[in-house]
From Swiss-Prot:
It is a peripheral membrane protein. The keyword Transport applies. Belongs to the ABC transporter superfamily. Methionine importer (TC 3.A.1.24) family. Its EC number is 7.4.2.11. This is Methionine import ATP-binding protein MetN. Residues 8-249 form the ABC transporter domain. It comes from the Bacteria. It comes from Streptococcus pneumoniae serotype 4 (strain ATCC BAA-334 / TIGR4). PANTHER family: AMINO ACID IMPORT ATP-BINDING PROTEIN (PTHR43166), METHIONINE IMPORT ATP-BINDING PROTEIN METN (PTHR43166:SF30). Part of the ABC transporter complex MetNIQ involved in methionine import. Responsible for energy coupling to the transport system.
Length: 353
């Protein structure tokens, strides 16, 4: 069983500006297990970046308790000496939207700068830098300056630099926001690869649920400084509870865009009185069941599929359908019950039940 490598308990962060007190984070508790890729999602101003900055005490909380790798580093106040905190911070790497590379130094020199206070010899440092650049796919770019690198390559240098002190945790704060979609996927694939190869715990801060869907195994949703929903990616995507979470997921799955087109179709605009427009969501074993065929066999209910999507989330197939069900009123009622009994979520979008 995995252990919690990050424990944030009842964290508050408040800022005082003249006569105003601003609460950026309010009573947030999050536990992240070793080896997780953990996404924290929210719109601008949700408090997600402020929250992750307390992990290494770049931002001191106003209240709460922080435990990192079994060491309590904050409990109402900082519990470490300055030297202990410096060493603990070496266990936590960070990458950002802006790469923060030194323009007058090569890729190799930028990574080596993170080893400035290391006890390694000059030769050992050089070998380590070469290994890190190879790990992020830049072995042939060691002597290039930032101006000679693409955005994705600059972020790879930043990742190599963040890994220089062998951290157990890597915080990615909107690290793909400035990148094009193709490069974003490449950087996410790299983070996933590092997670698997190094056993690295990755904390992703993002406003895009698509990023969480691509590589995370757990997700927390923040709004106005509060944690409003948390769970496995599979749980959250298959059964979101909060309206904001539902909005994020609709954007990530493309269902909203699809519904605009579906609603213009003749069969939907002029839905017959013996028909229902329904949305079906299913996960795991349910995706293997020939459910719609069974509806006709047992209830004489016809199913016209207008939209379908299936994805693999954290190793589990998750599907979504928009379907017109047609049949006698009693048969439609029986078919709906059969669908729910099969473990499939059903939502009537249009039609009289």
């Amino acid at each position: 069983m995995s252990r919690d490598i990050i424990k944030l308990d009842q964290i508050d962060v408040t800022f005082h500006q003249k006569k105003r007190t601003i609460t950026a984070v309010k009573d947030v508790t999050i536990h992240i297990q070793e080896g997780d890729i953990y996404g924290i999602v929210g719109y601008s101003g949700a408090g997600k970046s402020t929250l992750v900055r307390v992990i290494n005490l770049l931002q001191k909380p106003s209240a709460g308790k922080i435990t990192i790798d079994d060491d309590v580093i904050f409990d109402g106040k900082v519990t470490l000496t300055a030297e202990q905190l410096r060493r603990k911070r070496q266990d936590i790497g960070m990458i950002f939207q802006h790469f923060n590379l030194m323009s007058q130094k090569t890729a190799e020199e930028n990574v080596a700068f993170a080893l400035k206070h290391s006890e390694l010899s000059k030769e050992e440092k050089k070998a380590k830098v070469a290994k890190l650049l190879d790990l992020v796919g830049l072995a042939d770019r060691a002597e290039n300056y930032p101006s000679q690198l693409s955005g994705g390559q600059k972020q790879r240098v930043a990742i190599a630099r963040a890994l220089a002190n062998d951290p157990k945790i890597l915080i990615s704060d909107e690290s793909t926001s400035a990148l094009d979609p193709k490069t974003t996927k490449q950087i996410l694939a790299l983070l996933q690869d590092l997670n698997q190869k190094l056993g690295l715990t990755v904390v992703l801060i993002t406003h895009e649920m698509q990023i969480v869907k691509d590589i995370a195994n757990r997700v927390a949703v923040m709004q106005d400084g509060h944690l409003i929903e948390e769970g496995s990616v599979l749980e959250i995507f298959s059964n979101p509870k909060q309206p904001l979470t539902q909005d994020f997921i609709s954007t990530a799955t493309g269902i909203d865009e699809a519904m605009v087109k579906i609603e213009k179709q003749e069969i939907v605009e002029h839905l017959s009185e013996n028909s229902l427009l329904v949305q079906l969501k299913y996960a795991g074993a349910s995706t293997d069941e020939p459910l719609l065929n069974e509806l006709y066999k047992h209830y004489q209910v016809m199913a016209n599929i207008l939209y379908g999507n299936i994805e693999i989330l954290d190793g589990t197939p998750v599907g979504e359908l928009v379907v017109v069900l047609s049949g006698e009123k009693a048969a439609l009622a029986g078919a709906q019950e059969a669908i729910r009994q099969a473990g499939v979520q059903l939502k009537v979008l249009k039609g009289v039940q």
